[in-house]
């Protein structure tokens, strides 16, 4: 929004043109979202307390967590508001990728909000009925797949249309899985569905300790932002042998907003947490990360960078599958972070060590850009 204002002012005073710079706008998006979170954070927390939107803690979880009962939840509203305001201010709003990400944020945030609200209203940690929850999450993921496929079909040359659908294989130069060969985009849409829903639920499962999920979200958003920048610049894309997709240039603004909003939220979510993001934050942030990975065609690199989320989700799948088949548990408790609590790690130790792992994984994911 403001980029158009400053471009117009640039006709009268040339330095205003500098604001149209992509890197400067990305930094401003970080600062704006961070400032928004810091300014309104305490107000949101006080409001959530006044509304008695306290977290319900499962009795079958770690007993040390029972002291967190009543801590305000649904703090993800603060994160999403900061992202929305910052993106609307600094992104070029004629870019369809920006609007898709904002719509994803709203859809998945709304589902998460309904889930959180039902947990609070009925004092029941289960929340929204599973089939209803996954129906709406599926609708959101399918919306992304169909929208991106439609945008790909509008491209003037067939090569770009293919690149916007085919799955890029990191490290191997010019290797791709040709989803574009499947008629009507069915292969691409189905794959997109699993990436987005998988990412959304994986982040949600990770959000179980103070500060555990939000910093890895910030780190992965930074990594994907770098990949969006590369993919959106024809020179870097050609040099690094990644698909050039012009729309990705503005995606870095959304990534910047996610970074700023996440860091601002961490201020209040660090141990001992004053507020939890809830499903409204976790589901939407995960879905946005998954969507950006699809937009940049870096789904495999995303799985590496978000390896912490992958491990948390796999731990639940293994635990449930093992118990149903063998009546035995693989871990003392799932998701994975609870297993380490059960073997004697303190909550702060689990969080700090998982953060270190997240940093390493993001670096490894970024290395795939150069190793080709």
Curated annotation (Swiss-Prot):
Cofactor(s) listed: Mg(2+)
Localisation per UniProt entry: Cell inner membrane
EC number, UniProt record: 2.7.8.13
Ranges that cross the membrane: 2-22, 71-91, 98-118, 134-154, 176-196, 211-231, 251-271, 275-295, 300-320, 349-369
Membrane topology, record value: Multi-pass membrane protein
One term of GO molecular function: UDP-N-acetylmuramoyl-L-alanyl-D-glutamyl-meso-2,6-diaminopimelyl-D-alanyl-D-alanine:undecaprenyl-phosphate transferase activity
Reaction(s) this enzyme catalyzes, per UniProt: UDP-N-acetyl-alpha-D-muramoyl-L-alanyl-gamma-D-glutamyl-meso-2,6-diaminopimeloyl-D-alanyl-D-alanine + di-trans,octa-cis-undecaprenyl phosphate = di-trans,octa-cis-undecaprenyl diphospho-N-acetyl-alpha-D-muramoyl-L-alanyl-D-glutamyl-meso-2,6-diaminopimeloyl-D-alanyl-D-alanine + UMP
Chief location of this protein within or outside the cell: membrane
Assigned keywords, A-Z: Cell cycle, Cell division, Cell inner membrane, Cell membrane, Cell shape, Cell wall biogenesis/degradation, Magnesium, Membrane, Metal-binding, Peptidoglycan synthesis, Transferase, Transmembrane, Transmembrane helix
Functional pathway: Cell wall biogenesis; peptidoglycan biosynthesis
Any Gene Ontology biological process: regulation of cell shape
One Gene Ontology cellular component annotation held by this UniProt entry: plasma membrane
Function recorded in the entry: Catalyzes the initial step of the lipid cycle reactions in the biosynthesis of the cell wall peptidoglycan: transfers peptidoglycan precursor phospho-MurNAc-pentapeptide from UDP-MurNAc-pentapeptide onto the lipid carrier undecaprenyl phosphate, yielding undecaprenyl-pyrophosphoryl-MurNAc-pentapeptide, known as lipid I.
Similarity comment: family membership: Belongs to the glycosyltransferase 4 family. MraY subfamily.
Protein name stated in the entry: Phospho-N-acetylmuramoyl-pentapeptide-transferase
Gene name of the encoded protein: mraY
